[in-house]
Amino acid sequence: MPSNQTIISIAAATLLLVSHAAVAQDQVVKIGISGPLSGANAFAGKDNENGVRLAVEELNAKKMTIGGKTVRFEILSEDDQGDPKAGVIVAQKLTDAGVRFVLGPYNSGVAIPASRIYNDAGIIMSTVGTNPKVTQGGYKNVFRIVASDNQVGSSMAAYAARQLKVKTVGVIDDRTAFGQGVAAEFSKQAKASGLKVAGHEFTSEKATDFAAILTALKAKKVDAIFFGGYAPQGAPMARQMRQLGLKDVKLLGGDTLCSPEMAKLGGDAVGENVLCAQGGAILEKQANGPAFQKRYKERFKRAPDVYAASFYDQTMFIAQAMKASNSIDPSVVGIAMHNSSYKGVVGAYAYDAAGNMKQSAVTVYTFKNGAPVALASY
């Protein structure tokens, strides 16, 4: 007759086997994240990662099933440093790791070369890279999850002409794919709106001294300066504008300036003198926006930055398409995404054949008390 200890041991072993069998029934779907997790734009990369992570945690808690098996999402996050060469290495690394979906890159200059690798591997890439070239490669599984430079740059120019009554503008870009693209679109719309573009100066994404180019634009008596670049350069530029007597000249920019980091780095030099245009509607005015902000802050102990909500939404859209197509195969899921739409916390998502959003709101912000404040949404 078996002892009580033997019976307990057999029961424990049986429970362990059942547990392993349950795990074996899981389908693991690896989601890659590519973004700048080090360097000046690490704040943006981490914010984007947090948006994906929050979505994945919520999806795993729901235990979604595909083909009768529970789907378990795993995140593989890599630092592409905001550098095109590093981004290509990250793309190959994520491909080799068996990733099926990639959220990122953040930078257009990284997204453009990386998209070829992801496409060749049949991986869906969802990026906030706004340069129009990102979706011009003819890759069916590339999705731009926000407005493009065409919309962002032109919206800022139109606002400057109509609302700010600007007459003469200067333009500066940092020579990155993003900076050049958004500056070109701003200049095009500025001229179409009757503004005089008095000069176009250049800097780099690592520069800290802008005195020479700001002085050149000051001599041309500009009412505003549009900067195609990132917050780590935009903030010191705002400070130096004040130091050079340009305190009444507006500093305008694209989505990369619409971050609390801009005010954090620029201090009191960043206020209502700085305006930026960002793809997406006003989050706090969306039906589920405040609830998302609350969950994000509870989880990460900080407020969401520019694109956390967009990455959260796209992750949820991918899951919806998986469920609708009853597949985890990116080639099948991609078709389902092109043929459907998703209502997210920051807007509605539907894509054209090239992977651009069919409709995307653009919101113009300024800064008050160290935080971005929405002025208008189009």
Features from the language model and the residues they span:
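Expand to "…catalyze enediolate/carbanion chemistry for C-C bond making/breaking, isomerization
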Residues: L15
